UniProtKB/Swiss-Prot annotation:
Co-factor note (free text): Binds 1 FAD per subunit.
Gene designation: tazF
Name by which UniProt lists this protein: FAD-binding monooxygenase tazF
Entry keyword annotation includes Iron: no
Keywords: FAD, Flavoprotein, Monooxygenase, NADP, Oxidoreductase
Species for this entry: Aspergillus terreus (strain NIH 2624 / FGSC A1156)
């Protein structure tokens, strides 16, 4: 009968060694594996913790390469005035290190970075990290079944290799300048929100802020009070929402509040009470998804509430209401809480501008409304959201990720890419980043990756690569199910991509809930992968038919009871 086994490049048995029974080796004896993770932000640190403390595997040699001088990722890079997290702080933690000492319900970026540094030191997570090192390219070598890596450290280029490669750089790590003529000609100070200069004194300056996404909504009210003037240039209006989980705030309306010293002491003294409080917050964060279902009662309530609040906050400037309130469904762009943002734009020294920026001059802007001079241009213009890694990736058979994902990224449950063996991604395309805490998503993905690492090591596997058919079918499911959600409703947002012959395809959001994502990743689901073994017999890893513990002096011969 005809075979239905894979005939892809690399499945050739010439790559394997002939199998011969080894009567001295117990079954499931793990082989040594080298695992390299790129990035020491939340993802890399979670992986480091699991391998050192929660799931130690003495057969794994972990190395983490970090381009910066310190851990932290997003929270190391983003230091602009007002930077903070709009997810409630009790939920924005490493799951293994709840923090009873948060100062507020929604905390600033500096406090989050200090928490990351403190946690890293407490658990000794730096020992596997190499700093100031950038991955330039990764190429799969079929003969050795390893990733060949080229890296750069302080101007020196060197090579490395690994059995398993993990991308922990995140989807919002490659910031970008706006595509405006004359950007390089500006003689004043030019900053990006993701590359802010904390030494620069912006007080008393004439400031232009380009953009009105999440960063701009934090930046504008922080700069406005001490600016000589501030103009916020806006291409598309955005919903300025209340903070997440408003019902858990003091006033029930999402206003931030400080935890009292008595509350923090109670959190420290009563772990069970603190756990129940954190669970209540986590529950609230996870219910946000229902508000993202187009036409749902929860979505209608959110729309009416936020529109009413925006009209109320703009009551003194009725001329701005139609310009500032969008006509697309709320949530189509990322919900952007903006305490003080609308108020700042109504101050005497500030205003929004909807004029098109034709070009940047040495002294400021030339727009449809004329010329205007500035001392500082602050670009809150976002990131490269193509999901193409910041390094060149060449997989099996010469497949290139930058080519295959040029128009539309397509992954397997935000974690694997077809044609790229032994390669895993944190927060890849179609990840559940639209609600819930990203820390939990990373936790679930890390377990899934380590399940594969353990399987590869203990079953003498040469390579695992998700099938093209699995990626195709998952993305077809995602495309259809995401039509239920507001993210697909045609607004201008980084969540989606416009491709030839197709409507907007949502590439950033998972087609379901974080809970749904977690349950799916609880199992490896190897039927969706091409698995190749090191020997010609796929059951070679069974060894001599015994377990190692059976020959140990105090081996538990009834461990299953």
């Amino acid at each position: 009968m005809p075979s239905n086994e894979s005939t892809c490049l690399g499945s050739d048995r010439n790559m394997q060694t002939a199998w011969k029974l080894n009567a001295s080796t117990p079954g499931f004896t793990p082989k040594k594996l080298r695992v390299v993770c790129i990035g020491a932000g939340l993802s890399g640190l979670t992986l480091a913790y699991k391998l050192k403390h929660e799931r130690p595997m003495d057969f794994v040699d972990l190395r983490i390469y970090e381009k910066n001088h310190e851990v932290g990722g997003t929270w190391l890079d983003n230091v602009y005035p007002g930077v903070g997290c709009d997810i409630p702080s009790p939920s924005y933690v490493f799951p293994f290190e709840p923090n009873p000492d948060w100062s507020k319900f929604y905390v600033g970026g500096a406090e989050i970075q200090q928490y990351i540094l403190r946690t890293t030191a407490k658990y000794g997570l730096k020992e596997r990290i190499v700093f100031n090192t950038r991955l330039l390219k990764a190429e799969w070598n079929e003969d050795s079944a390893k990733w060949k890596l080229q890296l750069e450290q302080d101007g020196r280029v060197f090579d490395d290799e690994t059995d398993v490669l993990i991308n922990g750089t995140g989807c919002l790590s490659q910031w970008k300048w706006p595509d405006i003529e004359g950007l390089d000609c500006f003689k004043g100070k030019l900053l990006h929100s993701a590359r802010w200069d904390p030494e620069y004194n912006w007080e008393g300056k004439r400031i232009a802020v380009i953009g009105n996404g999440s960063s701009a909504l934090q930046l504008v009210p922080s700069l406005q009070p001490k600016a000589a003037k501030l103009v916020n240039y806006i291409r598309h209006p955005t919903w300025v929402s209340v903070n997440f989980c408003p019902d858990l705030t003091r006033d029930g309306m999402g206003s931030n509040f400080e935890f009292t010293e008595e509350e923090k002491q109670q959190f420290r003294d009563d772990p069970e009470m603190f756990f129940q409080y954190r669970k209540k917050v986590e529950h609230g964060v996870n219910t946000v998804l229902q508000m993202m279902i187009s036409g749902s009662g929860e979505h209608k309530f959110l729309h009416e509430t936020v529109e009413g609040l925006m009209r109320q906050r703009l009551a003194d400037r009725p001329d701005l209401i139609d310009k500032m309130i969008p006509n697309y469904e709320i949530g189509c762009r990322r919900l952007s809480p903006g305490d003080g943002y609308l108020e700042a734009l109504q101050a005497a020294n500030a205003r929004p501008s909807f004029a098109n920026i034709n070009r940047i001059t040495p002294t400021g802007f030339e727009t449809d409304e004329g010329e205007e001079e500035f001392d500082l241009i602050a670009c809150a213009t976002g990131f490269n959201t193509s999901y193409i890694p910041p390094f060149k990736m060449t997989g099996r058979g010469g497949r290139r990720l930058d080519v295959e994902w040029k128009d539309k990224p397509a992954a397997y449950f935000a974690t694997c890419a077809a044609g790229f063996p032994n390669y895993f991604i944190f927060a890849g395309p179609n990840a559940p980043i639209g609600h819930g805490s990203v820390n939990r998503m990373i936790w679930f993905q890390a377990d899934y990756m380590l399940n594969w690492v353990e399987k590869i090591a203990t079953e003498d596997i040469r390579s695992v690569a998700v099938k093209d058919s699995a990626v195709r079918d998952f993305n077809e499911f995602a495309k259809e199910n995401l039509k239920r959600f507001v993210w697909s409703k045609g607004c201008h947002a980084w969540y989606s991509k416009k491709t030839d012959g197709e409507d907007n395809i949502v590439t950033a959001m998972y087609p379901g809930s974080l809970l749904h994502f977690k349950v799916y990743l609880d199992k490896i689901r190897g039927e969706h992968f091409d698995i190749q073994y090191n020997t010609s017999n796929m059951f070679g890893f069974l060894g001599n038919g015994e377990l190692a513990l059976e020959r140990e002096k105090d081996g538990d011969m009834a461990f299953y009871m």
